[in-house]
């Protein structure tokens, strides 16, 4: 996606520049960069604004009849629920979701990915099996919520802000983190819910960003640790230790045992060094949350440009949040390397349609109050902008939630749209870095994989600068292009992968953002 160009006009009521963006010649709307007052004339569109248009919101540039399709990005983003006049605000009061045929055109847009002649590297930690870590944590996982408190007590003992002496001799260890959850029992022992939980825990237990892992249970839970290890092909060893509260003799003894086991792991965990490795060892989870009308104009395409640079150097990017590509999936199926890969994506879309129907929900309920306040109206519009995170390379594989990602290039993982749940699945699949775009303002952070956050607009950057790592609002201001800022972001991702701490890491985020997807009934 090339950089948008802001068309400038002069208002009829005052001599001042009026900034709007037309994203595609076929669009029926332009996007306001500033608040537009009623009576403002958009000269290049030959339109006079009627009513107040907030920044990031849409202005109709032609009359649209009731039931007609309305286009943004050159694609259908919804249908007029009432007649829309040129110059009017286009939003929830006059634009709605609607069904329409999508041409999946499986694999018809596949293009050869030309490897870059310019190498890219970062300073990573090479594990014994050849995988590369971007961070070096000791993790404490729980098989069930019942062991969450003891897990947290063990990790708190090693917190540098509480007991700085505990890790003073181990500067190469990034920390000891407890990743707890609210499930693990009173669910179907043969159901999908337990399988997903075990797949998620298994992915974290063997994640390269962990130098060692404890798995703690209560003892009588449905999610038995022995079965967890068996289903995930894991075995206990010096860097993966398991035990239960019931077998250990209660809370106090369990906490003491956990602290002692972590102490035993620390010397080996600290005995690492970073070395220069290829960017092909990066697997980046792509996220967006608190999206606004600028997300698909700035931060998402900037991330997409960085993804293209990564993929051309042999790296991997994981696009996810299935409800947030809904209605735009045909843009990905065209890029699927085979029709079979494209059909996998369509199958996940159909699963979500059935899942939403069973729950008495509608996928179009996905846009949040914040999304709508920021200018997004339908899930179609949100999806069209969200797909921009994926850049322009081929879609090489589709995975279910938390499955190990083994393919190189752009892949898709089926996840909900809720950011912590989605990112948890990506990290379980092997993501060693997360990149997160936001327009309304997110404070998300992740452990053990660091999260880099991009602001879609300068107002957010200024308002919430201590949570943001890059300001993509510069694209709107014309001081840079999507391609240029994408290159800046790519270097930032390499720097963070090399050990530079992201904003969320500086604030200590990550322990509470581990949220496995729960789809089972709780009995």
Where are the predicted features?
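Metallocofactor- and cofactor-centric catalytic cores in central/energy metabolism, strongly enriched
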Residues: 2-433, 437-523
